[in-house]
Structure formats: C-alpha cells, structure tokens
Amino acid sequence: MYLRRAVSKTLALPLRAPPNPAPLGKDASLRRMSSNRFPGSSGSNMIYYLVVGVTVSAGGYYAYKTVTSDQAKHTEHKTNLKEKTKAEIHPFQGEKENVAETEKASSEAPEELIVEAEVVDAEESPSATVVVIKEASACPGHVEAAPETTAVSAETGPEVTDAAARETTEVNPETTPEVTNAALDEAVTIDNDKDTTKNETSDEYAELEEENSPAESESSAGDDLQEEASVGSEAASAQG
C-alpha cells in the first residue's frame, strides 16, 4: 500500500502543477540543463528508485530460477536415461550367466548318469551269475536222463562259448573284465537253456519209442552203452 501511494503521488504531481508556471530567472534554463535529477521532490525520487530496483531484481531472480530449474531438469533427465540403460543391460548379463550355469549343469548330469549306470550294472552282474549257477545246479536229473543229448550239447557248448568270447573281444577289445564275464555268463545260460530243451525232447522221444517197440528200445539201449563206453575211453585217453 505504501508503494502504491508513493507511485500515485509521483504520477499526480505533474498533473497538479499549475498550467502557467511562475516566471523563472534568466539562469533558469542553464540550471535545468545542468541538473540530472528527475522532476519532483527528493522523497518521490527515492521511492521511484526503490520501485524500479525491486522490479529489476525480481525479474533477474525469476530469470535465474528458470534457468537453474531448466538445467536441473536436464541433468535429471540424463541421469534417468543412464539408469534405464544400465537397468536394461544388467538383466541381459544376468540371463547370460543363468544360461551358462544351466549348460554346465546339463553337461555334468549325463556324466553322472553314465557313472551311476555303470555302477548299477557292476552290482547286478554278480547276482545274475549266481542265478545262472543255481539254475544249472537245479537240473542235473535231466542231464543224466539223455546221454546222447548231453554229449551233443557238450560238443556244441564250447563252440558257442568260444564264438561268444570271440565276438565280445572283436567288438570291444578294450572293455573291462566285468563286461566279458557278463557276456560269458549269458552264453552259459543260453547253453543251459538249449540243454534243457533238448533233454525234454529226448525224453518225449524215448517214451514214444518204448511204447511203440520194445525191440527198438533194447537196440537203442545197446547203442547207448556203446556210446557211453566210447565216451569213457575218450575221457581216459584225454586224461592219459
């Protein structure tokens, strides 16, 4: 309010001046030309200076604040862009690390499975051999029932085992002894199965022959005795 009154007074002073000013002296023009003061009293001039100074300072302060705020916004925008780029780059690096870890785990898993499978096979092979031995010991009666079939199977057995051993050695020359023993056990089981089947068939044929002709049974018994004698002589010669 004080500034408003001062401004109104300074603007109203020229209007209130008389239309016909008082006559001046001869040197009045020189005084006016030499003086640098604004028209009006000294108090009104001071108020004018204050108003102008305040307006200029306010304008300068406003300009300074706008410039500094623009700079601050610009710097914040730059920092936000940098943070966004970093946030976009770091997830890709994390994904690459996760992919590398999964690949390592997948490469290690098959090796562990292979080692476990080998251990399981090595543990199961002794039990399989024990079962085969029990089956072979459980059927001695069938072997005694038909000497002809046993002789044939005895002749063919070593050949089959030798062939199986050769095949295993040719296919896998660098395999472990456990694998070769497993192959030999399988060959022995095959031979035993063949022996049992042949023994059963020979028993059936013998029953049929006995029912049909007793004479043929006697001749076959003689032939069996001759074959047993020949087998015994061969065994004695081999031992000698």
Curated annotation (Swiss-Prot):
Q: Which residues lie on this side of the membrane: Mitochondrial intermembrane?
A: 64-240
UniProt keyword list: Membrane, Mitochondrion, Mitochondrion inner membrane, Mitochondrion outer membrane, Transmembrane, Transmembrane helix
| Topological type in the membrane | Single-pass type IV membrane protein
One matching Pfam family, short form? AIF-MLS
Q: Which GO terms describe its biological process?
A: anterograde axonal transport; axon development; axonal transport of mitochondrion; cellular response to gonadotropin-releasing hormone; cellular response to hypoxia; cellular response to steroid hormone stimulus; cerebral cortex development; negative regulation of dendrite development
**Taxonomy, superkingdom:** Eukaryota
Under what name is this protein listed? Protein MGARP
Which gene carries the instructions for this protein?
Answer: MGARP
